[in-house]
Amino acid sequence: NAQTKQVSMLEGTDVPTLKRYIVEGQQFYYRNQQHPGSPIKDLVQVYYQFKNEQKAGLGMPMPAGIVRVYQQDSKGGVQFVGEDRIMHTPKDETLNIKIGNAFDVVCERKQTDYLRISSNVYEMEYEVTLRNHKSSAINVDVNEPIGGSWRMIRSSHEWTKTEAWAAKFNVPVAQDGTAVLKYRVRVTY
């Protein structure tokens, strides 16, 4: 009779989670000179991270499908926060559930310098401004894909090379505050 039924496979309450704010840069930033000084807005994605373990009230294999996240509001009611599709996930593995984009955290990126050193070597400098309009301080992971062979010349914040072609910056942003990440990278193609 063409009906669709949804069945709850697994339910956890009071699951300890880590709320993460993530900005994903785009590969094209390093391919040519952008318009220095012209800011580009980037989305700040919101993730909840948790471990599928017994002590969190979970701890059993999760089949691929949709995971919905609910949160208690200030009046004790339960509010839908977001949902994401997951792959098959064994017990004791970590899940990252993307629940959407932050509306109270703003990211703007601009290229502040572009230098062609030779036919295949370039230096670029970027400024990533994060504005937090929340009533609490947050940390934002800024993930920057960088093509070619690259070397970080300088950075205002600590960073890690997460892959051959990517750097990750962790930027703390104060409550109702602004933080500016500045970095310069040399790329060889």
Predicted segment positions?
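Long, intrinsically disordered, low-complexity accessory segments associated with secretion
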Residues: 1-189
